[in-house]
Design a protein with these regions (language model features):
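Acidic, low-complexity intrinsically disordered segments
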Residues: 2-26, 30, 54-95
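Beta-strand elements of well-folded, non-transmembrane domains
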Residues: 31-39, 44-52, 75-77
């Protein structure tokens, strides 16, 4: 059985990863969370490319792209790990 990753899960993963980036140019770590009865974990090492954006509140360094060096996305239910069809490039569209 394979768990189909829905747009809502990609969005949730992107939000949690963006929060974990913490303004740096490189991220290596994991984000874990529950979603729809599944325990999810993204473990990744990524290079963070940023661009300067001028906003009325001031300038910010927004994420322009993430270049994955290595990543794994795990989903598990009460019976153990469940294979999934996660795509890092699809998740990036939600950043």
């Amino acid at each position: 059985m394979s768990y189909s990753v829905l747009p809502e899960l990609y969005r949730e993963t992107a939000v949690r990863l963006a929060d974990a980036l913490d303004g740096g140019g490189y991220f290596s770590g994991s984000v874990r969370f529950a979603f729809g009865g599944m325990e999810c974990r993204l473990t990744a090492s990524v290079i963070v490319c940023r661009r300067r954006e001028s906003l009325p509140e001031g300038d910010v360094d927004a994420v322009a792209d993430l270049v994955p060096v290595w990543w794994e996305f795990h989903t598990a239910d009460g019976e153990g790990e469940v294979a999934n069809d996660f795509s890092f490039s699809e998740m990036k569209a939600y950043l």
